[in-house]
Amino acid sequence: MDEAPRIAIDAMGGDGGPATIIAGAAQARDRDSSLRLTFTGDETVIRAEMARFPQLADSIVVHCDDVITGDDKPSQAIRRTKSSSMGAAILAVKAGEAAAALSAGNTGALMAIAKLSLRTMHGIDRPALAALMPTLGDNDLVMLDLGANTDCDARNLVEFAVMGAAYSRLALGIESPRVRLLNIGTEELKGTGELKEAAAMLRQQTGGAWRFDGFIEADRLGRGEADVIVSDGFSGNIALKSIEGTARFITDLLRRAFSSSLRSKAGFILSRPAFALLRHHLDPNNHNGAVFLGLNGLVVKSHGGADEKGIANAIAVAAKIAREDLTRRITDDLEDFRSHAVQTEGVA
């Protein structure tokens, strides 16, 4: 993409509302002055927030009367696609007026509106929600699905694997990502029928720019033993929330321990650099920006509780996948995988 991408941002979504979204967008613009931004939502509120940030003066504002809340069901959100700030951001992508859409709002509503408006790519049954997660290895990992689909069959999981590998190569620069399926054990006989069937299909893969390394258990997620971890959305969302909750627990536990006595406080001063590094790795704002894979258009989901830095990071994710044409990469990889699958069946 020669021209800097335009990102359509739902300014009304998220816990912090327009103040956090606009401030985060200003941070993103400070990092990358070539970014072009469109904000959707209450124009009066948005422009009042934009007035604090001269770097956003050339941004476009699309007025919307309606806001999708966390209490809205997907079916309700769909009916308000044209009138809502969330829907307007996605429709901008559909119309070619933006390269990607971003929202920190209701995940289920965002998924429903995006799928209905943009449709899934040819041959893809369901889109998946993918995000980067920190590890103890040299690179982060891509994990999907994180909640878009609670019930998946083997074909869905295989498609997730191919799409996740494409995203891993783009986001992390890994030439041949290691793909593994999240399971209750690493043995081939462990797991549901869908998992075992998906594993069998992935083992037959004879080409392509990734490799299947079998199953992985939840306690090994952050060990750097995989580049892409695939699961259904139910298990993936539980794993994600468990990781986030554990990170907050550890942070709070350390804070309490370091403030328990004068000796502990002195210890904190000495270990502050290490503690700062730990907080950096555990802070979800540093990995904010999950991507819906498998749609005919790019949509990024920000964590609802993200701060300004988190919003800026999510915008950076949207800009990167737009610049490097993630949709085309996924299409090419799916075609490559299917051609190898046909060749394998022919040999068999």
UniProtKB/Swiss-Prot annotation:
Role according to the record: Catalyzes the reversible formation of acyl-phosphate (acyl-PO(4)) from acyl-[acyl-carrier-protein] (acyl-ACP). This enzyme utilizes acyl-ACP as fatty acyl donor, but not acyl-CoA.
EC annotation from Swiss-Prot or TrEMBL: 2.3.1.274
Assembly mode: Homodimer. Probably interacts with PlsY.
InterPro entries membership: FA_synthesis, Phospholipid_synth_PlsX-like
Domain of life of the native organism: Bacteria
Catalytic activity: a fatty acyl-[ACP] + phosphate = an acyl phosphate + holo-[ACP]
GO molecular function terms noted in the UniProt entry: phosphate:acyl-[acyl carrier protein] acyltransferase activity
Protein name: Phosphate acyltransferase
A Pfam family of this chain: FA_synthesis
Species of provenance: Rhizorhabdus wittichii (strain DSM 6014 / CCUG 31198 / JCM 15750 / NBRC 105917 / EY 4224 / RW1) (Sphingomonas wittichii)
Protein family according to the UniProt entry: Belongs to the PlsX family.
UniProt keywords, alphabetically: Cytoplasm, Lipid biosynthesis, Lipid metabolism, Phospholipid biosynthesis, Phospholipid metabolism, Transferase
Cellular component terms (Gene Ontology): cytoplasm
Subcellular location: Cytoplasm
Pathway connected to this protein: Lipid metabolism; phospholipid metabolism
Lineage of the organism: Bacteria, Pseudomonadati, Pseudomonadota, Alphaproteobacteria, Sphingomonadales
GO biological process, one term: phospholipid biosynthetic process
